[in-house]
A protein has these predicted regions:
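A SIS-like phosphosugar-recognition module
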Residues: 384, 452-453
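Gly/Ser/Thr/Ala-enriched C-terminal appendages of enzymes
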Residues: 456-457, 469, 503
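Extracytoplasmic/secreted cell-surface and envelope-processing proteins
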Residues: 355, 455-456
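Mixed-charge (polyampholyte) low-complexity IDRs
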Residues: 466-472, 483
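C-terminal functional modules
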Residues: 476-526
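Short acidic/histidine-rich active-site segments
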Residues: 446-451
Length: 526
């Protein structure tokens, strides 16, 4: 039996459906509304998407070309349009996720107005955006299915089976989300409470970083401060307990390390014996070996293999790591997280360089062979300059003539048509596939692309509309393109739910329904 017919049968079997005082309730309409609202709660979504993500992780282990991707979205509408576009262009949304960026929540969704990425925004704003994203995606399901139901009603007997097949094989817009909890917004109890709220909103994957919560910085800014492993592992446990309490047993934890760019620690790690995790953490500290006679009032000392050393402490009461230890600390962080409950790791880097990433992953995989990475293809990188410089360096090392290029000025558009620039663009084009194969990257994401696309498209419209083009600036560059490129939002009344509203009015009021989609609706021009 088809999915649609099964739904009709189930609706028809409702015990009260045939009572005389329910005579106006149509089981077909009930069946349609149920299919349009497959996911009743955020927990339903989290369970469904966690299962998808786990299967994707298993598939990637067998074939690295099956990596996954996402774009950061700061509003439900943006996430909805992304998934509608993916289905339109590729016919499926398999291995395409959502990403929720703490940076964009801070910059765009706080009631305080725009904030830096320092965990100053409201804790509840994260779960609120997750809920908003899935509300819009559920509406995308209802809208598309509503169109198919109307198509079914108008189809000839010969065509009905084809339309019903589309309904039965409908692919939902609901996809996994990787959601940023920053450093947990407080202690482990605060982390647990916030994670629980995020899961209840639909999150199947939570990303948490090893920075100090109240000193948190954007991963691509200076002044980052990490915490000893024991504190971070307690927060991983808090997130896992939140998943398990809510019945999302296969929820995913992404453990992010910021150690590559973090030169400071808030505290010395507790160590009970040489070589334990606390001792390994402290071994990266920048210290001075001193004698007892050189001790000063207020000094903090460590006994390291029988020698007394003094960690370098700043006026901020933070301790300094030795320079050049970032990669080693990232490797230790990642191995430790994977051995203590994390499913995926995230190493925040200062540049998009496959060699750098793969070198760290090679060391991690010696201990955890199936280690997988989530990687931030960050807009904070100047991708053009980075890859042109990488190509410049490779050409120089191989003996090619690079005398016509200025390495520090390779962003200049005068180089756009050169061999170097084209080679760099080729490397950017294949970066994700290459990194998935060579560096163990399971998931590629861009944290805040839609922040930038909103700014760019608005700038272009403002330039044309308020300039000499006037109304043509909108018509030629927006509406005409929407029509010709099949952008669903050109019929904005339909996208906002007007046609679904008309369907419901007919369900509820029958022939007395006052509908918005009549002959005088200007959307008929499209």
């Amino acid at each position: 039996m088809s999915k649609y017919n099964k739904s009709i049968k189930e609706a028809s079997s409702i015990s009260d459906i045939n009572k005389s005082n329910w005579s106006s309730i149509n089981p077909n309409y009930v069946a349609r509304m149920r299919l349009q609202n497959e996911f009743k709660t955020g927990i339903d979504i989290a369970k469904y998407t966690a299962s998808i993500m786990r299967k994707d992780m298993e598939a990637y282990d067998l074939d690295s070309s099956l990596y996954t991707q996402s774009l950061g979205c700061w509003h439900g509408f943006i996430g909805q349009q992304k998934l509608i576009s993916i289905k339109k262009h590729f016919g499926t949304n398999k291995r395409k996720y959502l990403y929720l960026s703490g940076w964009m929540i801070a910059a765009l969704r706080s009631q305080f107005g725009p904030l830096p990425d320092q965990s100053m925004h409201e804790k509840t704003s994260v779960a609120s955006l997750i809920n908003e994203l899935y509300t819009f995606l559920k509406q995308a399901d209802a809208r598309e299915l509503g169109g198919l139901f109307r198509e079914l009603d108008g189809a000839s007997d010969n065509d009905k089976s084809e339309v019903q097949s589309k309904i039965d094989n409908f692919e939902t817009h609901i996809v996994p989300i990787i959601a940023d909890i920053d450093a947990g917004f407080g202690n482990e109890e605060a982390t647990y409470l916030m994670a629980k709220q995020m899961i209840e909103a639909g999150a199947c994957a939570i990303q948490i970083e090893n920075q100090v919560s109240d000193e948190k910085q954007c991963g691509h800014q200076d002044g980052k401060v990490t915490v000893p492993h024991a504190e971070f592992l307690a927060k991983l446990n808090a997130v896992r307990y939140a998943f398990l309490e809510l019945g999302v047993d296969d929820g995913i934890i992404v453990a992010r390390t910021d150690s590559l760019g973090a030169g400071l620690t808030a505290r010395l790690a507790i160590t009970n014996e040489e070589g334990d995790l606390g001792d390994q953490y402290n071994s990266f500290l920048d210290v001075d070996e001193i004698s007892e006679s050189n001790m000063k009032h207020g000094d903090v000392m460590i006994n390291r293999k029988g020698k007394i050393v003094r960690p370098k402490r700043l006026q901020s009461n933070l301790y300094q790591f030795r320079k050049g230890t970032g990669e080693e600390r990232c490797i230790l962080d990642s191995i430790t997280s994977l051995q203590n409950g994390a499913d995926l790791i995230w190493i925040e880097t200062e540049k998009p360089h496959i060699g750098q990433i793969s070198a760290m992953m090679d060391e991690i995989k010696k201990v955890v062979p199936n280690a997988k990475l989530v990687y931030n293809n960050s807009p904070s990188f100047n991708w053009t300059l980075n890859f042109r410089q990488q190509v410049f360096d490779a050409m120089s090392e191989s003996g090619d003539d690079v005398s016509s290029y200025d390495r520090d000025d390779l962003m200049n558009e005068k180089y756009d048509d050169t061999k170097l620039a084209k080679l760099a663009d080729d490397k950017i084009r294949t970066f994700q596939a290459d990194a998935a194969k060579e560096a163990g990257i399971f998931h590629h994401l861009i944290t805040l692309p839609t922040y930038h696309t909103a700014a760019l498209s608005t700038d272009n419209l403002a330039k044309e509309y308020f300039g000499s083009e006037g109304m043509l600036g909108y018509v030629a560059n927006v509406q005409r393109k929407e029509i010709r490129e099949g952008i669903a939002c050109v019929k904005h009344q339909n996208m906002s739910g007007s046609d679904m509203g008309d369907d419901h009015k007919e369900y509820f009021a029958g022939d007395a329904a006052l509908k918005a989609g009549g002959k005088d609706n200007t959307m008929n021009q499209f």
